[in-house]
Regions:
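Non-catalytic accessory segments flanking enzyme active sites
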Residues: 54-62, 66-69, 95-98, 122-138, ...
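Loop/turn-rich, solvent-exposed surfaces of beta-rich toroidal or solenoidal domains
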Residues: 213-238, 289-292, 298-299
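Short consensus segments that form the blades of beta-propeller domains
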Residues: 28-29, 86-93, 149-153, 227-230, ...
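Alpha/beta-hydrolase-fold serine-hydrolase catalytic core, especially in secreted/extracellular enzymes
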Residues: 166-168, 232, 240-246, 251-252, ...
Length: 646
C-alpha cells in the first residue's frame, strides 16, 4: 500500500519533498476543517469469474513546490533548529492539486492480487480551471460515484461534483500511452456538476450533503439533501433533484473548458427549513436522515440564536418543524443509528454540562411527533464551585439598528453606587460565538475569577460573529478591524448605563488570536475608551497570514490594498499611547498559526515609533497555551498587569 499511495520519497527536507498524497495540507486543515486526504469507496465491485473484488480509494495529490517555505523555531530550542513548513501567505501561490484513484484487486481470501494508480483522463486543471480548493470529498453510498466539493480562490462559488470511477485511467508513462488509455473511456463518461452555490460574501464550508441511493431505472437523476447558506443568507436544508445530463466528450483530444460543461439541470429544489435562523452545519455538525419515515433530524437555532436544539422535519412533505430538546439550555446532540434514541450534552449559563439519553416514543403512524422520554444519564451536572456566579446575558440595539447579544460578569462585591474596573473580553472574528446559553465555568473560568477579584467582565458578540446569518457575519467583508470595535464600545456603554457599576475611566480590552488583534485595534482606535490592552497572539499584518482565511474575508491584497492597510495594526503604531504600562503583548514563540513574526514585526514598529510596550513570550507554546505552568503564569501575568495599571 505504501508504494502505491506515496507519490514522494518521504524526504525529511521540505524543500526536496514538495509532493504528498492522501494528506490534507496545513491550510485545508486549519481553515477548512478537512483533516484527511483520502476516502475509501464503501463498496467493492466483483469482476469476472475469478472472484476478484475491486477496491478503490479516492485521494488528493498535492504539489507544494511553488508554495513559500517559512521557518518556525523548533520545540527543541536547545538545538537551535527550526521547523520548516509550506505556508501560502495571502496573495501567493497555493498548492497544485488533483484527485486520483488507488485501485486494487483482491482474491477470495482477501489477498491483494494487483494494484494500480489511476489519474483523471484529462489534467485536473484543464477539467476544473477555476478550482482552488477541494473542500470536501467522499463517495455515494452505493460506490457508483466519487463526489467532491470544489471552491474557487475567492471562495464565492462552490460546486458539488460527481466523478464516475470510469473517468480515471491508469497513470501513463508517456503521451502515446495516455491516448491509448483515453480511448477506453466512453464519450458519455464525464464529471457532473450537480449543484452550485454562489455569493458575493463568502462560502462557509460544511459537511452536510446526503445523497440518496438512485432507485433502479432512475439512474439519470440524483436526489440529495444539502444545507445552503447562500440562497437566503441563513443556512437551511434543501431536498434537491439534479438531472445527470450527459454530453459527449472525446477524451483523447485535449479538453478545452467551457463554462456550462458538466452542469446538470436542477429538476426540483424544495426548502425543508426556512426563516431568520440557522441550521447548524459548520464545525462537524451533522444531519441524520431516516429514509423509512422520510424524516431528517438536524440541529439549529430556530428558537433563539443563543441556544442549539435538535429538531426534526419531514423531507417528503416539509412544513412543521418539531423541537426535541428542552428549552432553557443549549444542546449538542447525536441520533442513534435506528433513530429511536438521541444523546444530548447540554448546559446553560447557570447549569454545568450533563449528558442524557432520550428515547423517542409515540405512534409509528406519526413519527414526526414522537416525544422524547428520559432514558438514561451518562453524566450528571457537577455542582458549581461555591464562588461561581454565572454571567448575565443581555441584548441591545446599536445605532446602526442591529440587535446584539452580550454577557456580563458582575463583580462579586458589587454595591450600589460603587464603580468597578472592567475587562472587555473579546474575540470578535468570524466563525465564533462567545455569548450563548451554555455553561462558561470551564473554558472561561478565569472570567469568573476576575469578577471574584472585583472586576466587571463584559463579553459582546458584535457584527462578524457567527450563528446570526451571512449578512451579519459578512459585515467584516474586506474590512476586518474596521467595524468590530464600534459594536464593542456601544455594548460597553449600554452595560455601563444599565447596571451602573462600570468605571468607564478604567476599562481593559483583552483577547487572544483575533481577539488579540482587536485588543490592539481598540487601543489604536479608542485610546480614550480603553486604558489598557492585553493582546494575546495577535495578527498584526494581514499580508503575513494564510491564503485560505485571509482571502475569504479580505480578498487578495491587490484587490483590497486599502482594507489590508487599514486592518493591519502594525502599520498604525503611531496612534498607540505614549504613556507606559498601557500595552501588554503575549505570544507563544512556537505558534504555528499566527506566527511569532506578527509580534516580532509589531515590536520592531513600536521601537521605531518610540512607543512603550510590555512583552511576555512563552518559549514552548504554540497558538494555544497547553502547558499548565504556562497557563498559570499567563493568568498571574494578566492579573498583575490589571492590578498594577488598571
Amino acid at each position: 500500500m505504501q508504494s502505491l499511495l506515496c507519490s514522494s520519497p518521504g524526504l525529511s527536507n521540505v524543500l526536496d519533498d514538495p509532493k504528498s498524497a492522501g494528506v490534507a495540507t496545513f491550510v485545508i486543515q486549519e481553515e477548512f476543517d478537512r483533516f484527511t486526504g483520502y476516502w475509501w469507496c464503501p463498496t467493492a465491485s466483483t469482476e469476472g469469474s475469478e472472484d476478484l473484488k475491486t477496491l478503490r480509494i479516492l485521494y488528493e495529490e498535492v504539489d507544494e513546490s511553488e508554495v513559500e517555505i517559512i521557518h518556525v523555531p523548533s520545540p527543541a530550542l536547545e538545538e537551535r533548529k527550526t521547523d520548516s513548513y509550506r505556508y501560502p501567505r495571502t496573495g501567493s501561490k497555493n498548492p497544485k492539486i488533483t484527485l486520483k484513484l488507488a485501485e486494487f484487486k483482491t482474491d477470495s481470501k482477501g489477498k491483494i492480487v494487483c494494484a494500480q494508480d489511476k489519474e483523471l483522463v484529462q489534467p485536473f486543471a484543464a477539467l476544473f480551471p477555476t478550482v482552488e480548493y477541494i473542500a470536501r470529498a467522499g463517495w455515494t453510498r452505493d460506490g457508483k460515484y466519487a463526489w467532491a466539493m470544489f471552491l474557487d480562490r475567492p471562495q464565492q462559488r462552490l460546486q458539488l461534483i460527481l466523478l464516475p470511477p470510469a473517468l480515471f485511467i491508469p497513470v501513463p508513462e508517456n503521451e502515446e500511452q495516455r491516448a491509448e488509455f483515453a480511448k477506453t473511456v466512453p464519450e458519455n463518461v464525464q464529471p457532473f456538476v450537480i449543484y452550485e452555490e454562489t455569493t458575493d460574501v463568502w462560502i462557509n464550508v460544511h459537511d452536510i450533503f446526503y445523497p440518496f441511493i438512485q432507485p433502479e431505472g432512475e439512474e439519470e437523476e440524483l436526489c440529495f439533501i444539502r444545507a445552503n447558506e447562500c440562497k437566503t443568507g441563513f443556512c437551511h436544508l434543501y431536498r434537491v433533484t439534479a438531472v445527470l445530463k450527459q454530453g459527449s466528450y472525446d477524451w483523447v483530444q485535449p479538453y478545452v473548458h467551457s463554462e456550462d460543461d458538466f452542469k446538470c439541470p436542477i429538476k426540483e429544489e424544495i426548502a425543508l427549513t426556512g426563516g431568520e435562523w440557522e441550521v447548524l452545519a459548520r464545525h462537524g455538525s451533522k444531519i441524520w436522515v431516516n429514509e423509512a419515515t422520510k424524516l431528517v433530524y438536524f440541529q439549529g437555532t430556530k428558537d433563539t440564536p443563543l441556544e442549539h436544539h435538535l429538531y426534526v422535519v419531514s423531507y417528503e412533505s416539509p412544513g412543521e418543524i418539531v423541537r426535541l430538546t428542552t428549552p432553557g439550555f443549549s444542546h449538542s446532540c447525536s441520533m442513534s443509528q435506528n433513530f429511536d434514541m438521541f444523546i444530548s450534552h447540554y448546559s446553560s449559563v447557570s447549569t454545568p454540562p450533563c449528558v442524557h439519553v432520550y428515547k423517542l416514543s409515540g405512534s409509528d403512524d406519526d413519527p414526526l411527533h414522537k416525544q422524547p422520554k428520559f432514558w438514561a444519564s451518562m453524566m450528571e451536572a457537577a455542582s458549581c464551585p461555591p464562588d461561581y456566579i454565572p454571567p448575565e446575558i443581555f441584548h441591545f440595539r446599536t445605532q446602526s439598528d442591529v440587535e446584539l447579544y452580550g454577557m456580563v460578569y458582575k463583580p462579586h462585591d458589587v454595591q450600589p453606587g460603587k464603580k468597578h474596573p472592567t475587562v472587555l473580553f473579546v474575540y470578535g472574528g468570524p466563525q465564533v460565538q462567545l455569548v450563548n446559553n451554555s455553561f462558561k465555568g470551564i473554558k472561561y473560568l478565569r472570567l469568573n475569577t476576575l469578577a471574584s477579584l472585583g472586576y466587571a467582565v463584559v463579553v459582546i458578540d458584535g457584527r462578524g460573529s457567527c450563528q446570526r446569518g451571512l449578512k451579519f457575519e459578512g459585515a467584516l467583508k474586506n474590512q476586518m478591524g474596521q467595524v468590530e470595535i464600534e459594536d464593542q464600545v456601544e455594548g460597553l456603554h449600554y452595560v455601563a448605563e444599565k447596571y451602573g457599576f462600570i468605571d468607564l475611566s478604567r476599562v481593559a480590552i483583552h483577547g487572544w488570536s483575533y481577539g488579540g488583534f482587536l485588543s490592539l485595534m481598540g487601543l489604536i482606535c479608542k485610546p480614550n475608551v480603553f486604558k489598557i490592552a492585553i493582546a494575546g497572539a495577535p495578527v498584526t499584518v494581514w499580508m503575513a497570514y494564510d491564503t485560505g482565511y485571509t482571502e475569504r474575508y479580505m480578498d487578495i491584497p491587490e484587490n483590497n490594498q486599502q482594507g489590508y492597510e487599514a486592518g493591519s495594526v502594525a502599520l498604525h503604531v503611531e496612534k498607540l499611547p505614549n504613556e507606559p504600562n498601557r500595552l501588554l503583548i503575549l505570544h507563544g514563540f512556537l505558534d504555528e498559526n499566527v506566527h511569532f513574526f506578527h509580534t516580532n514585526f509589531l515590536v520592531s514598529q513600536l521601537i521605531r515609533a518610540g512607543k512603550p510596550y510590555q512583552l511576555q513570550i512563552y518559549p514552548n507554546e504554540r497558538h494555544s497555551i497547553r502547558c499548565p505552568e504556562s497557563g498559570e503564569h499567563y493568568e498571574i501575568t494578566l492579573l498583575h498587569f490589571l492590578q498594577e495599571y488598571l
